[in-house]
Amino acid sequence: MSGWPRIYYKLLNLPLSILVKSKSIPAEPAQELGLDTSRPIMYVLPYNSKADLLTLRAQCLAHDLPDPLEPLEIDGALLPRYVFIHGGPRVFTYYTPKEESVKLFHDYLDLHRSNPALDVQMVPVSVMFGRAPGREKGEENPPLRMLNGVQKFFAISWLGRDSFVRFSPSVSLRRMADEHGTDKIIAQKLARVARMHFARQRLAAVGPRLPARQDLFNKLLASKAIARAVEDEARSKKISHEKAQQNAIALMEEIAANFSYEMIRLTDRILGFTWNRLYQGINVHNAERVRQLAHDGHEIVYVPCHRSHMDYLLLSYVLYHQGLVPPHIAAGINLNFWPAGPIFRRLGAFFIRRTFKGNKLYSTVFREYLGELFSRGYSVEYFVEGGRSRTGRLLDPKTGTLSMTIQAMLRGGTRPITLVPIYIGYEHVMEVGTYAKELRGATKEKESLPQMLKGLSKLRNLGQGYVNFGEPMPLMTYLNQHVPEWRESIDPIEAIRPAWLTPTVNSIAADLMVRINNAGAANAMNLCCTALLASRQRSLTREQLTEQLDCYLDLMRNVPYSTDSTVPAASAGELIAHALQMNKFEVEKDTIGDIIILPREQAVLMTYYRNNIAHMLIMPSLMAAIITQHRRISRDALQQHVEALYPMLKAELFLRWEREELASVIDALASEMQRQGLITLQDDELHINPTHSRTLQLLAAGARETLQRYAITFWLLSANPSINRSTLEKESRTVAQRLSVLHGINAPEFFDKAVFSSLVLTLRDEGYISDTGDAEPAETMKIYQMLADLITSDVRLTIESATQGE
């Protein structure tokens, strides 16, 4: 590039460098999209805009990609490195330039015909300034239409700092030439496909237009389901039809979001400023799968785990910065207080009551509203656990909203709905102190402005945040496989509840929980907490802690929990240094070295972080516990132990493996433990390696409390085979509370009601007890004896004496 064009671009770049602060999506385009910078790269933009081109250039130079303004020289021919698909509008509309894209595509394809070694990577790129979707019945053109020069100037002036450059996966022109030829018709087809690609990408980033709120309410009121519910309300409560209709409108006002792009922009500024000061980084993994789903036109339902009130903001912020539309979020009605409620509502929150029971009008209005969101194409987010986890483990799923999602599909006419499980992890959860109090019996504080301000005032260094997108679940594919006849239940008017709905929803919910856990994120805090809580004195020397973290990291890297889970790339020493900055641990120095201590008052709180990754380490921990207690054990006996206990662990921690996969998992973990020197293999028997017995014991401690809990329930069941389920749950909790006091167990979930409830249900499903409450004494005693061998004698005595003393 020389002469006048260079001067022109330099002059144009001056205001752009001041006004525009764009973001690249993905963050590292070459690495994440697999671009080969040693091969020629050309860029395709949707329409002629020099401002877009220079914005793209700034991102290319920042990410070591070829400069789009530098032409490509191929076989002596100089070709522009960028192509505009459409000439774009002009200030003077009577002048319409000839579109050059087809000619340029043809020139590039022609070069591939004459040069078999050539392979140009064609990279589609969208540059967007602002993402307002606009309102229905608004302007004729969408807000992100092609702009002429004057319009573009105002758009950049106002929205230059809310812009992003979206790189799409490259297309190989060599493959195009080989498979489809190089004539002009193929070039025209290529330009047409590129136009469709950009239109889809724009919809994925901006979303459908927003309805006027009153128009939405009028449409809902006119629906047959709500009209019938209003009539029922008037009849059952003996009120006028108008009054019943007003009740329905009041419920719509209570439920419906009031999405505002300007509020999204403002909040993005505030959150960007806040995150940079509170978090040392937000780590996002597998976002490309979601971008692809949005691009392919899927109706996306985000299903994250629920750790904190921060989840709402963090996930919307992450999605916005991944070039996706922030979803409409189902939020608990407890958050609908001033000023949080109105703000959340403008950020896309719609509010849901804890229970729908006894209020047919409410359930109908909510179901119709959710169905309307799906039919209009808005992405939706809800927390399938129904509330925040107080223990750090996943809660049993609440299936009401999921059931309504499938019922929306049974109305017909919606785009394919895909559920996207999401694991959210933190190194610091601001509510963790409150959770510990609630688990001890304190009444939950009602959310309010003073409580919110109190929480915000305590925010300090929050370390790293993690958002891992799990394996998506296309609902249509799932139903086709598991309920082939589901289409027979489609009814565009009535909310259908076919016989297959409840078991299918339960199965989908359980699968979602497994997929959320599959995307788990290990981090410095949860690894250090796991190691220190495994030590009976909650303290380890720096060397011991480093060795233990190395053990965990090697297990997770060499035998990954799943392909979606993430493990820090940092070394054990670096992770410890980072964790110490969080001010949760104390360091005592003596003449020999450092001792890292988890203070007693912090220990209960830190179990929360340990529990976040308990599922990722429970299998090696269980194996270590069995080997440690037996000193030596054959592979077959080890497998029998694991298989006997696995159904309880799978149900409690939403583990991913089926029973038939256990043998290969055990073999892989045993090989890794042998490689680390934790165990030795002699005559097909696994033996403790005395030189690494401490590391193995600390690894085994991860399963210690779980095994003690199971021992309690199996002992009670063996001692009283006719005990009913509710009494078994209650007595198990009582013994667990006693055990925690006598043996200093600092884990609130140790006697959590939900944990024992889940365990007793699993025992019923596995046939240890029947619905009438009769246990099979021989079987339960056999499992108890197995568990008794895996716990210490003093704990065993406490358990057995608890029932003998009654």
Swiss-Prot record:
Keywords: Acyltransferase, Cell inner membrane, Cell membrane, Lipid biosynthesis, Lipid metabolism, Membrane, Phospholipid biosynthesis, Phospholipid metabolism, Transferase. It comes from the Bacteria. A motif (HXXXXD motif) lies at residues 305-310. The keyword 4Fe-4S does not apply. It is found in: Cell inner membrane. One of its GO terms (cellular component) is plasma membrane. InterPro entries: GPAT/DHAPAT (IPR022284), GPAT/DHAPAT_C (IPR045520), GPAT/DHAPAT_LPLAT (IPR041728), GPAT_PlsB (IPR028354), Plipid/glycerol_acylTrfase (IPR002123). It catalyses: sn-glycerol 3-phosphate + an acyl-CoA = a 1-acyl-sn-glycero-3-phosphate + CoA. GO terms for biological process: CDP-diacylglycerol biosynthetic process; fatty acid metabolic process. GO terms for molecular function: glycerol-3-phosphate O-acyltransferase activity. It is a peripheral membrane protein. It is an enzyme of class 2 (transferase). CDD domains: LPLAT_DHAPAT-like. Its EC number is 2.3.1.15. Pathway: Phospholipid metabolism; CDP-diacylglycerol biosynthesis; CDP-diacylglycerol from sn-glycerol 3-phosphate: step 1/3. It holds the Pfam family GPAT_C. Its main location: membrane. The HXXXXD motif is essential for acyltransferase activity and may constitute the binding site for the phosphate moiety of the glycerol-3-phosphate. Belongs to the GPAT/DAPAT family. NCBIfam families: plsB (TIGR03703), PRK04974.1 (NF003441). This is Glycerol-3-phosphate acyltransferase. The gene is plsB.
